[in-house]
Amino acid sequence: MSNEELTERWQGTLMNNYGTPRLPLVRGEGARLWDADGKEYLDFVGGIAVNALGHAHPAVVDAVSRQIASLGHVSNLFIAEPPVALAERLLQHFGRDGKVYFCNSGAEANEGAFKIGRLTGRPHMVATRGGFHGRTMGALALTGQPGKQEPFLPLPGDVTHVPYGDPQALAAAVTEETALVIIEPIQGENGVVVPPPGYLKAARAITAATGALLVLDEVQTGVGRTGHWFEYQAHEGVLPDVVTLAKGLGGGLPLGATVAFGRAADLLQPGHHGTTFGGNPVACAAGLAVLDTIADEGLLDNVKRQSETLRGGVEALGHPLVAHVRGAGLLLGIVLTEPLAAQVQQAAQDAGILVNAPAPDVVRLMPALNLGDDVVEAFLGALPGILDQAAETAHGDGRSGE
């Protein structure tokens, strides 16, 4: 089976909502992937921040194998031990009493938050421009990207979108009728946009003053991605009412969670919400393996260390196509001086490195949390040539700006 053959089969059977993906991949191990033609790649996409421990990590493989061999699925008509254990472990890392609702994705986790908001009895919600919370209808109503919303109007809910990172705009939008405010601590899909210092603390104060719930969408930033268990923990004085999780939580398996605290934890009651596969024992066993491996192997420290190396290494290149690097931990955006992210993405792939272009001028890095020094060195060593190739593709004159 070749790349061409697998691509043709994909095109003949799957809907076109993604377009044709750029590369057929057949195997992964650690930070490396192989395509159907046998070419090897360094993975800095990580399944879009999903593969927290890389590919085929022994702890995840063992946990999944053991669980599927004993109890694969029973539905939420019955109790299984893995979701209970995972909920307990999550709450330990939050350091707070709360309740957990398990689902299968970030969009579903945010749908759960949407329903919790509705159950307050208040009709209004506030989200941010550029924010991304999923593509199901409730989550899409919260998403602040009109291009994704327009084909599906009208959307549910009374949602006001305000500029991201602007506490004054947020304060003006939140009223006594506001059920919730939902914010990403870092906007990943919008290009790894980091808010100004104090923004989350201001959001907490604004919501507390009006009785609105503060929902933090940590689907992309959570589970160690930024060097903290959850990114809000890097911000003093911020205790959210609801946190939504997915992506890295399952270590490659579909797993999401809506975690609620205080009064928000008691709003969902029997009949209000549910999912057949939520809390699946196999997915939850994988999630428990992910959390325990992060803790046991000290991966939060590794994330911080490799983040500094990557950020410093990229900026030290002094390449005219690089403006700066933003983000936190191993969620980094290389901001370009020109809108050539797509060209950089392709040049990197040609060089055997997979990166992502979420915005025309941003290259996003989301590698595994156990990223090794050798992979970082290989990336930094290849990057100048990748940037040169991208500029040459766009301009035909070698390095951008010369």
From Swiss-Prot:
Superkingdom of this protein's organism: Bacteria
Catalytic activity reported: N(2)-acetyl-L-ornithine + 2-oxoglutarate = N-acetyl-L-glutamate 5-semialdehyde + L-glutamate
GO cellular component: cytoplasm
BP-aspect Gene Ontology terms: L-arginine biosynthetic process
Cofactor(s) recorded in Swiss-Prot or TrEMBL: pyridoxal 5'-phosphate
InterPro entries named among the record's database cross-references: AcOrn/SuccOrn_fam, Aminotrans_3, Aminotrans_3_PPA_site, Class-III_PLP-dep_AT, PyrdxlP-dep_Trfase, PyrdxlP-dep_Trfase_major, PyrdxlP-dep_Trfase_small
Modified residues (N6-(pyridoxal phosphate)lysine): K247
Subcellular location: Cytoplasm
Coiled coil residues, start to end: none
Residue sites binding N(2)-acetyl-L-ornithine per the record: R135, T275
Top enzyme class: transferase
Pathways involved: Amino-acid biosynthesis; L-arginine biosynthesis; N(2)-acetyl-L-ornithine from L-glutamate: step 4/4
Annotated binding of pyridoxal 5'-phosphate, by residue: G106, A107, F132, D217, E218, V219, Q220, T276
E.C. no: 2.6.1.11
Gene3D superfamilies hit by this protein: Aspartate Aminotransferase, domain 1, Type I PLP-dependent aspartate aminotransferase-like (Major domain)
Keyword Transferase attached: yes
Disulfide bridge partners, by residue number: none
Cofactor notes: Binds 1 pyridoxal phosphate per subunit.
Entry's family note: Belongs to the class-III pyridoxal-phosphate-dependent aminotransferase family. ArgD subfamily.
Subunit structure: Homodimer.
HAMAP family: ArgD_aminotrans_3
Protein's name according to its UniProt entry: Acetylornithine aminotransferase
Name of the gene this protein is made from: argD
